[in-house]
């Protein structure tokens, strides 16, 4: 399994010997500096894995995940795969698409832009991730898409956790080219969640959670919506989880970025709801996790939120309705979002986002390769 985002060692590098730090820090820094002008990653390859791959006896699956945005050069990835397939034909290539990068000229998240459907003629924003100073997406999109067609020619099978990403990919590269396997909570997290018991109903003001890696980024956290919730004053208690919170007030509790999953889930378990306002996610795992422990999610309209919530019978809302719902108690929120009781919602969600279900789907996928 190959994920390129590894400029520094993560916890996985220490726990699992099979997890390899692929892109050197210097390479990532060079790509970050040049990307703003070139709109592509100039450096980074998988050549150091070539000998290991071809010397592995028997059939082998190379499963790619997120390789873009400062980590690996796309053309070099394709060249590597061509060399591997020529030397070891029993290698199977699989690529899970976690965003729209495969169909755009540059962006990983479209943020509502549909310019990729007409060749990314003029980017409406240079700040959309990954940000640039010069827009060259329209010059790069045809060559980039050819690289993905090269991967398809090599027999690469594409998967996405989200239907809207798969549909976008299939609209460009052909019907049925990308299959869907929804995200689910991993088995380690599921073990943590299984130990969390429903807490007694909160007798005080509603506790509302906001979770994001970087709370300053408006694409992930609607800044205006959060300030509107803060303006509700004593009607709610707002809890943020993430780095660089710009939110301060008498009704705001900033917990910071919590790396301990058990502590984060325990804290969320105390909440009446999680408010989700991201425009740039595709199948957000935090929603699966919150819903799995019986915390209702009040989400603004987005394809990602609609797809995740629909799996447990939920719906999304306009920002004005989010403000209204955030002032309600947990059972009322569950009824409004999911059309059922809190207990029924809990049971439904535990099944809908099960990591075991995701694992079984992947096992079935691998068995049919």
Residue ranges of predicted features:
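A charged, aromatic-enriched C-terminal amphipathic alpha-helix characteristic of glycosyltransferases
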Residues: 196, 323, 337-368
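Aromatic "clamp/platform" in nucleotide-sugar-dependent glycosyltransferases that forms part
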Residues: 279
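Carbohydrate-associated surface elements
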Residues: 164, 184
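Short hydrophobic beta-strand element within catalytic cores of glycosyltransferases
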Residues: 296-299
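Conserved donor-binding/catalytic core segment of Leloir-type glycosyltransferases
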Residues: 199-220, 230
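Conserved acidic donor-binding segment of nucleotide-sugar-dependent glycosyltransferases
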Residues: 311, 315-337
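Membrane-proximal helix-turn-helix segments that form the acceptor-binding/catalytic region
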Residues: 116-158
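Short alpha-helical segment that forms part of, or immediately flanks, the ligand-binding pocket
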Residues: 265, 287-292, 303-307
């Amino acid at each position: 399994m190959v994920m390129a985002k590894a400029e520094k060692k993560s916890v996985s590098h220490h726990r699992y010997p099979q997890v390899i730090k692929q892109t050197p820090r210097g390479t990532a820094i060079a790509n970050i500096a040049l990307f703003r002008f070139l709109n592509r990653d100039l450096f980074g390859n998988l050549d150091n894995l070539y000998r290991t791959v071809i010397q592995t006896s028997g059939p082998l699956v190379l499963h790619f995940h997120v390789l873009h945005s400062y980590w690996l050069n796309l053309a070099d990835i394709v060249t590597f795969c061509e060399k591997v397939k020529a030397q070891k034909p029993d290698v199977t290539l699989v690529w899970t698409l976690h965003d729209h990068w495969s169909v755009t000229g540059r962006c990983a998240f479209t943020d509502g832009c549909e310019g990729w459907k007409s060749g990314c003629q003029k980017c409406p924003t240079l700040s959309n991730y990954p940000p640039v100073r010069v827009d060259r997406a329209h010059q790069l999109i045809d060559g980039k898409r050819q690289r993905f067609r090269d991967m398809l020619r090599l027999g690469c099978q594409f998967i996405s956790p989200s239907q809207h990403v798969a549909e976008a990919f299939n609209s460009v590269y052909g019907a049925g080219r990308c299959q869907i396997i929804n995200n689910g909570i991993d088995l380690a997290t599921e073990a943590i969640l299984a130990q969390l018991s429903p807490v007694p109903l909160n007798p005080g003001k509603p506790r509302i959670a906001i979770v994001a890696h970087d709370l300053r980024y408006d694409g992930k956290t609607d800044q205006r919506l959060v300030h509107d919730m803060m303006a509700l004053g004593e009607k709610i208690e707002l809890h943020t989880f993430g780095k660089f919170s710009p939110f301060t007030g008498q009704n705001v509790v900033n917990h910071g970025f919590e790396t301990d999953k058990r502590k984060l889930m325990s804290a969320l378990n105390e909440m009446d709801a999680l408010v989700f306002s991201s425009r740039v996610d595709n199948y957000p795992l935090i929603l699966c996790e919150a819903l799995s422990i019986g915390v209702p999610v009040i989400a603004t309209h987005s394809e990602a939120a609609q797809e995740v919530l629909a799996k447990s019978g939920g719906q999304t809302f306009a920002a004005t309705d989010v403000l209204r719902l955030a002032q309600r108690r947990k059972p009322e929120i569950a009824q409004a979002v999911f059309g059922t009781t809190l207990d029924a919602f809990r049971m439904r969600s535990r099944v809908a986002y099960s990591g075991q279900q995701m694992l079984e789907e992947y096992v079935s996928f691998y068995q049919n390769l």
